[in-house]
Amino acid sequence: MIEERMVQSEDPFAGSVMDGDEVVDVLNDLLVMARTGRNGFVACAEAVQATRSLKEILLSRAQGFRQAEAQLVAMIRTYGVEPTRKGAGGGGLQRSWRPLDGNAGDRSDAEILRACELGEDAAIARYRHALGEQLPVEVRDLVQRQFEGVQRNHAKIRGLRDAAGARRS
């Protein structure tokens, strides 16, 4: 049972209160997305043909999602529940990573990086949605920090994709 933690938003104009169940739902949604992102970046790192440094960048992004997972799990547990197990397996990738379905080894690095960028697009959308909720201050701070990291990485992945596409031309 979720520990009853009713939390008032810091926004003086927002009169709504988000209960612990709702907060945990938001955090679990981000947790599933982080697990999917980790799996997606690992798959991309395994599929790219380019330099070792590109593989290392993609694996570093997977590690970033792993760290986000750990932070989200810890926050969920402060509500007295265990986090969802969804997305924990290394199985199928979610819709945002669909371009990797099938034989990713037949794809160019630019195509693989485009799949990474689409995955980051999905992560940005999930974080924006979460930040639109009336989250407790400590949860909002965590979500905001993670969101900013996803935005930075999205820009980096886009730059890598653009460079890989230019090399193909």
Residue positions per predicted region:
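Conserved alpha-helical segments that form or flank metal/cofactor-binding pockets of metalloenzymes
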Residues: S53-G91, I157-L160, A164
